[in-house]
């Protein structure tokens, strides 16, 4: 009895121990699971905290980098013309803190020597430039820069002079054209004999002035006409006062026309004009003067129509003058 009871007690004890061990194991498993869960949750919380902190620092750095200037830039304050202060960003490579380079001030002697060398040769290089810089107590760079600036100034002055000369020449040409046009517009038949050769101007002037006025102011013209008429059969003696007072004979005008045969007035046949005048002068002096005036008007019209400055004339009667010249 007692032995069986002991066996049952042992079995019960073993079962109870097994149950107890299983219960303890289950509890330990629960505890371990809870501990693992606590560790994981705490680790996740820590990781989230670290991640959020790192993200915050990155965002802060980004914001700082966005607001701050790069290393190669800097900000300066500048007052504008209106008085307001503005902030501008400039690269540090400008080196604004560096003092400005002073301009080289040449003395009168240095300028004189440099100008003389420039007139001699516009390009001074090599040993000549070194020697010139040593004589003038300057550096070669200063001498080189002075010659460069002097060449630039000379080119600029030459451009201005050429423009001025072109303007002056255009103005002079315009003035000369206008003067010629004015002379052509004011050209009258009595003023045309001044353009004739000397041998023909005396006869035409005496014919235009008439027999009465030729005695007072045309003695030289009458003498020339008599000398021209002498080979035609007249006397070789000089003309007297009586003959000078009267109108010149037709033979004299014929001689003047023959003498003027070698001369051409603007390429126009002058002898035919003088021959027609000489043929009519003996019969009626007034009629001769009228016909001569008509011939001179025709001659002046031909001169104006054949002028080289015809395109510049601003006359409304241009077509009529050309038609008259062609007729």
From Swiss-Prot:
Q: Does the keyword Transcription regulation belong to this entry?
A: yes
Q: Name the PROSITE patterns on file.
A: HOMEOBOX_1, HOMEOBOX_2
Query: Where is the major localization of this protein?
Result: nucleus
Any one GO CC term of this protein is:
nucleus
What subcellular locations does the record give? Nucleus
Q: Which GO terms describe its biological process?
A: brain development; central nervous system development; neuron differentiation; regulation of transcription by RNA polymerase II
Where is this chain compositionally biased, Basic and acidic residues type? 1-34
Q: Which residues form a coiled coil?
A: none
The record's section on InterPro entries has:
EMX-VAX-Noto_Homeobox_TFs, HD, Homeobox_CS, Homeodomain-like_sf, HTH_motif
User: Listed GO molecular functions?
Assistant: DNA-binding transcription factor activity, RNA polymerase II-specific; RNA polymerase II cis-regulatory region sequence-specific DNA binding
What function does this protein fulfil?
Transcription factor that plays a role in establishing dorsal-ventral polarity in the neural retina.
Name of the molecule in the record: Ventral anterior homeobox 1
Gene name linked to the record: VAX1
